[in-house]
Every structure is written in C-alpha cells, then in structure tokens.
Amino acid sequence: KTTFKTIKSGVKTGFMGPPNANAAPEASDKGQLMDTQASYAIPLALGTFNATNAPHALTHLVSTITRSNADDQGIARPPYSLMTGFIGTASISEALSANGKHAIAYGLLTTKTYPSWLYSVANGATSIWERLNSYTIENGFGGNNSMNSFNHYSFGAVAAWMYTHSLGIQRDPESPGYQ
C-alpha cells in the first residue's frame, strides 16, 4: 500500500503539474504532450489525477470525443469516434461515467460511424472485432488486418461498463461475491 501511494504521488507531481493551457514543455521534460482520448481516460479511470487536475482532464477528454480527430492515416473521423487505441478502450466509458458524463459515454457507445463499437454491428458482425479496421466499407478486408480476430476481448471491454452503468449491476465492496 505504501509503494502504491509513493508511485501515485510521484506520477502526480512528476507528470501532472497544475493545469495551464498555455504551458510549454520545459527543456528538461521527456516524452510528448498527448491530447488523445486514452491520455485522459486511463488516468481518470484509475484515479491518478489530483482534485485540481481531474476536472481539466475531464474537459479535455470530452473535447477529444466531441470533436473530429485524425486517425493514424491522417483521415478526419467524425465526433464520437472511438480513438482510444487498444489500451485506452477499457477505460474510456468508466472514466466518463465516474465523472458524471454518462450521456457522452452513451453517445460514444451508440455511434455507428467508423470507427465505433456499433460500426461492426451495422456491417454484420455478431462479435467484437480485435481491430476496428478489420472491415470497412471503403477497404473491405484490405485494411491493416493481417493479425486479426473477429471475436476478441479488447474492444469488448465496454461490456463491463454496460453491466455496471446500463444494467445497474454494481459490486458491493462490503460484501463481495455471489450471495
């Protein structure tokens, strides 16, 4: 528990200073500033942001969802496109709902344009694909899908959010397990 608190504190102070939209990176900073769905969703879902930064991160997360974003090929995708990548997908809906943005989370879930969870369903899928570009109307199966499963968990992680937030099935931390 002490190690967790030490690491969490170090991340907050080392990587997440006070919010300032005009702050430029320091010469000693390493890495890149990221303005992506995953860069906000993951730390929000894990509770990494402090009380000062969390509302700003949430505002930026909502912005990354409600605006058009360019994909890896530079093609502009419409608002409410799922642009989290493999790792951020499991965190985005929970990050939104945990911070009172249920309508944004539902909007993201119910979008049918590419790339989204329901795009594959609208195109005949009966399971969750490993890659959002497994099949597209524009490219058929000709996209970057050499390593691909048409029944995969990663993008299906939204199901946990659906159980807890759509169906209301919540765990009771005081009484875990089935009774």
State the predicted function of each range.
Residues 1-179:
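Active-site core of glycosidic bond-cleaving carbohydrate-active enzymes
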